[in-house]
């Protein structure tokens, strides 16, 4: 299969990680594969958010796939993206389309993982690295759908030209090293991984080899010697738990060095020392007991020796030998070690014969030349006669037995501290020691003072008194608060014990949180403390209960960590849920922590709402009005306890999430606050769930007209003068429950209906007059009212009201021409003279609008003579 070159693949991946990952509420910087990457300008984050949310809103697989396809097409049609893809080759453009689909697929609701930030590798890259966290449970053998990548085979020149080799794998199928990029590039290494790479024709997928729970990191094993020989530079969790890799002892790392750096004599010497060390492993516990003050155990172990480590990255450990049981072991020089980074350590001596450290070091330095052992490695000759090796400066240095034991036989926690100080330079360690040396894990000034008081077993009283006199003499000129830190640092370095001032004890309260937050390579925080903060401004996420930093970390909203905020902004649900099937209460983006609710206080879930109240209902009010469930634009279903204002709807809709129609509506009703939200929304009246039919109001024992009857009555208003014409309305059987729905007539249909009614009424009037002997063409009497064509009701004249129809005089005998039967006489319809002067059909009162129309009307009736 022909693929793109590694350079083109790196350029494509950098552009997509910048647009589709970093700009989608991501709070860290993604490492780029290409060194010369330039981000695309002019693309709004709002467009990217809309594309991602359109994919996350689809729950079913078919709808989500269609949404991914539409979002991909919309993304490729952006103006800036069109300009970028125009610079790609046809093969690279096809890979750009496939790569876009890979990155958009991770935002589907059915996707079981998400890309997060890990702080485990901060000591190596000085920033957080990306990782992959599981949102669902995977069993063994399950394929992690969506976590895929693309492979591009590399040549020798490309391997040398590629500066960042963080995603280079060896493929036996392709016959060489390949560059793998895509969502699968964020999977980190672990020596005991829970997944593995599976090659496919289109690239690479990942399959679970162990059960993966929710919240676990998805890891794979890169290779056996990927991080040096036997992965001795590995920082994974397995190496941390087993004290291997970079967490292992310096002696083990020195023995694993390559054979080319040492000659045969050195190899033989290392083998001998390793064999003797294995034989003396039983004496190590006794040596630790001797450090606690046991004279018998110290005499038994005084003849044993500890081998000297030949590691290049670790100070040499002294070889302790004692010629007699009562003599003090002789310290051995270590070499050139910085004065500011070391702590003096007293050797193991019996408790009855213990002497102060400053006196013992002075006596030992005077007699150091006498007790030189010629068998010691010549590299130690000519150095100072003090024993120093790096350790954390804590108040327990002189009393703790672990501080008197070489680091490779100390517990794992102590070795981590040694390794942490060894990775930083001298100035950083000095500042770190000055701040953390006065801290105690138990906390509090009282506990600290009790810990600082040492007994007669570890320190001489005269030495302590002289030290107090010196400190009081130094503080005589000024106050304690003005004492320089340089003097405190020198006093701690030159003395065998620690002395603390009141300033140090007050500083303990401030920096206790800093001690807990200090970075430790063994501390693995997926979404934990982001950075180091001396002030201790941290907060616990109310959703996932993780600790995050408010001052130095990313800016988040409310009480939620960056991971939960990003997940809620995309999927509108609390982490790790992505649909409404999980009935989980949401308190996202609220400015106060959630209150504890009882079981009877919970409302209904979304499926129950749709089942009982219809799918369009968005809120439920309890009978007592204590709990409100509402629908938001930015974050869907959320809960809040409101007993003070039970009937008031909570409003926290973001302005940028409103449509233009909604924004116009709410801007008229409320006001915009500084926080960018809309408040003072109008209250909507509460409507019952099932409204009963309203009772029919009775007027004079006559029921109100229905909607259909009122429509027919309006159509019947333009009738002839004072004669009522009964119109046969179609009988509609109305059901007993409720009012029937009548189809609303169009205005053209109403006009046509009125026209037909007028024609029928005119024909009936003509037939009636012919039957009574009155000519239809003769003008009507002077007092008669013309036939209106408007919608207004006809008015009866006073003459008609006074004279009943039976007392009217008989009309004259009609002429023979007019005595034709109605069937023989043709129906002639009079048309107006001009359409422009005709009466307007929209006239409701029946009156004419201007004198011209009045004159034309009188001319038609024969009353107006020119």
From Swiss-Prot:
Reactions that this protein is recorded to catalyse? L-lysyl(20)-[histone H4] + 3 S-adenosyl-L-methionine = N(6),N(6),N(6)-trimethyl-L-lysyl(20)-[histone H4] + 3 S-adenosyl-L-homocysteine + 3 H(+)
Compositional bias ranges of the Acidic residues kind: 253-263
UniProt superkingdom? Eukaryota
Where does the SET domain start and stop, copy by copy? Answer: 111-223
Compositionally biased, Polar residues: which spans?
Answer: 359-372, 728-739
A Gene Ontology MF term for this entry?
histone H4K20 trimethyltransferase activity
- Biased region (Basic residues) positions are 481-492
Q: Which GO terms describe its cellular component?
A: chromosome; nucleus
Enzyme class, top EC level, equals transferase
Q: Where is the composition biased (Low complexity)?
A: 390-403, 776-789, 834-845
Q: What is this protein called?
A: Histone-lysine N-methyltransferase SET9
Question: Source species, please?
Answer: Yarrowia lipolytica (strain CLIB 122 / E 150) (Yeast)
